[in-house]
């Protein structure tokens, strides 16, 4: 019930969409689209609000993913690194992921910093300097992997609640609505 309240007040956003999380390339196109639509419908029934941003907790994306997402009703996605696998690196945090049928999905692809380790915050000045010099849209992303956060992350949240020292904290759909894609790579081949 508390999560529903957070979700409805725009403080928290659920990114997802899959009903069964299995490798993306398994099964025919209609089954993959059904899986996404059923996942969105299930989340809508659970929290009372539609999921706008696709995200996946395991690896297994294919070159056909943007097409499948578009056919299932998604226009935005979140790419997260999984273990040893890296995500594409672009000049900006958002790129337009093209499909073989010409449809595009706005995709966030910035590798997040861990909010659980003090190491992240020890090097925060370096990360900020790099962002200000090289990034087309200055964005810091944090990823919480454990229930315990670094004490510095908690200080950062507390300081930001007093004054917006690091700018605005946005949900992913609001962020993708405000930030324009910096690059438009062509469709990835099926090879």
Model regions and ranges:
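Catalytic-domain carbohydrate-binding cleft regions of carbohydrate-active enzymes
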Residues: 1-191
């Amino acid at each position: 019930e508390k999560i529903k309240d957070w979700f409805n007040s725009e403080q928290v956003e659920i990114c997802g969409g899959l009903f069964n999380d299995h490798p993306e390339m398994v099964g025919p196109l209609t089954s993959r689209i059904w899986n996404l639509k059923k996942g969105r419908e299930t989340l809508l029934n659970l929290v009372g609000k539609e999921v706008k941003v696709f995200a996946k907790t395991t690896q297994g994306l294919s070159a056909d993913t943007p097409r499948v997402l578009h056919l299932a009703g998604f226009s935005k996605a979140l790419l997260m690194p999984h273990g040893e696998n890296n995500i594409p690196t672009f000049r900006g945090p958002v790129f337009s992921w093209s499909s073989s049928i010409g449809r595009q999905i706005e995709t966030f692809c910035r590798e997040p910093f861990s909010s659980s380790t003090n190491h992240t915050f020890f090097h925060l000045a370096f990360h900020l300097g790099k962002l200000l010099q090289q990034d087309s849209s200055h964005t810091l992303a944090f990823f919480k992997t454990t229930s315990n956060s670094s004490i510095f992350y908690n200080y950062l949240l507390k300081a930001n609640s007093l004054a917006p020292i690091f700018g605005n904290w946005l949900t992913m759909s609001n962020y993708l609505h405000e930030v324009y894609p910096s690059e438009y790579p062509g469709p990835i081949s099926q090879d």
